[in-house]
């Protein structure tokens, strides 16, 4: 793919390669589904409140294509969190906005996609009858917003649309700066507390709060205290870690934004520190950031995490899922 981009004098762009791979993966899953069907070993189930995860491995919130998510569930993920949805239609940032990087000899991805999505109204219509429910595993509905009011409006619509479903949790994504003013609920603990408490008045669904590794420890600690004050909640620690194109080793002509979020093994140490912090507060934790091996899983488990979110690893080698499951 990069060869043809260079041949045509176009900027290097990973996104067409990912889309091409997704289409062929989906086609292969229809032709030979047995390739992707793996049993989840017994006795690795995790219970979180009233949710049962047959495997503690979960798909992080970065995909919305049902056929790809279904493949990962067939391979043994215990849950999937859908890509963050916002109130209105979003086209995302200009391309190129996705690049492969090499950090300390390990593959990763630099991403500034910008939360493209159809908007909450179309999303709720699609998710109501999605075939993903047929797997019987908890689905995470990730919610973004430019204000506390937008979060609450989106939550209300989701609760109404999914009134006949009970195997899901809500995730408040307060870790992504793709907002109109660049601020998130992480910048205002009082507003976060208001959103959580008003959400709890609307529903008893489990609520996750997804935090950023770019936040300072005092901020994370404050968020942890706020989340802990609301019943039936857990922390998702965390998300991608911001790097400029220079820091990530990407040429400026090959990226439309000044920087983006790095994912992959390079961000694992920071995520591990976050897990330790929230474990000391006493919160249930989903660890997300750089997990790709059984050693990673054991490390975050030892620090107190009970669920393990995966993203880049699913793109680079989805067969790591059954491999890790077999060693849990």
Where on the chain are the PLM-derived regions?
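N-terminal capping/small domains of soluble enzymes
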Residues: 1-136, 324
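Alpha/beta catalytic cores of nucleotide-metabolism and tRNA/nucleoside-modifying enzymes
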Residues: 1-37, 262-286, 292-328
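Glycine/Thr-rich beta-alpha phosphate-binding loop at enzyme active sites
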Residues: 26-38, 174-187, 220-283, 321-326
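Catalytic cores of alpha/beta
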Residues: 66-72, 154-157, 215-229, 280-281, ...
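Glycine-rich phosphate-binding active-site loops on the catalytic face of alpha/beta enzymes
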Residues: 76, 81-88, 169, 174-176, ...
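C-terminal helical cap(s) of enzyme catalytic domains, especially alpha/beta-barrels
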Residues: 90-107, 244-260, 301, 312-328
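Active-site beta->alpha loop and helix N-cap motifs at the rims of alpha/beta catalytic domains
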Residues: 102, 106-171, 176-183
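Alpha-helix-loop-beta-strand connector modules within alpha/beta enzyme cores
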Residues: 103, 108, 117-136, 189-209, ...
């Amino acid at each position: 793919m990069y060869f043809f981009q260079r041949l045509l004098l176009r900027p290097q762009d990973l996104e067409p390669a990912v889309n091409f791979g997704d289409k062929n993966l989906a086609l292969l899953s229809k032709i030979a589904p047995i390739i992707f069907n793996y049993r989840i070993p017994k006795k690795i189930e995790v219970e979180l409140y009233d949710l049962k995860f047959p495997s503690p491995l979960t798909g992080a919130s970065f995909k919305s294509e049902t056929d790809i998510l279904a493949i990962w569930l067939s391979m043994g993920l215990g849950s999937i969190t859908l890509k963050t949805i916002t109130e209105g239609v979003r086209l995302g940032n200009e391309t190129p906005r996705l690049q492969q990087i090499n950090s300390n000899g390990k593959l990763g991805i630099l991403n500034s996609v910008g939360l493209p999505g159809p908007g909450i109204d179309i999303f709720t219509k699609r998710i109501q009858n999605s075939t993903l429910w047929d797997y019987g595993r908890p689905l995470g509905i990730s919610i973004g917003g430019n204000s506390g009011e937008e979060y609450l409006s989106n939550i209300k619509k989701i609760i109404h649309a999914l009134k006949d479903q009970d195997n899901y949790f809500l995730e408040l994504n307060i870790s992504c700066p793709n907002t109109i003013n660049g601020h998130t609920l992480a910048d205002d603990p009082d507003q976060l507390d208001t959103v959580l408490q008003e959400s709890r008045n609307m529903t008893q669904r489990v609520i996750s709060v997804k935090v950023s590794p770019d936040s300072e420890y005092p901020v994370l600690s404050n968020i942890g205290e706020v989340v802990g004050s609301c019943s039936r909640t857990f922390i998702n620690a965390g998300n991608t870690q911001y790097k400029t194109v220079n820091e990530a080793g990407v040429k400026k002509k090959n990226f439309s934004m000044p920087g983006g979020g790095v994912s992959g093994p390079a961000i694992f140490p920071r995520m591990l520190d976050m897990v330790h912090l929230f474990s000391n507060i006493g919160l249930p934790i989903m660890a997300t950031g750089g997990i790709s091996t059984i050693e990673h899983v054991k490390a975050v488990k030892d620090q107190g995490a009970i669920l393990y979110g995966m993203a880049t690893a699913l793109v680079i080698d989805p067969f790591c899922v059954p491999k890790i499951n077999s060693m849990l």
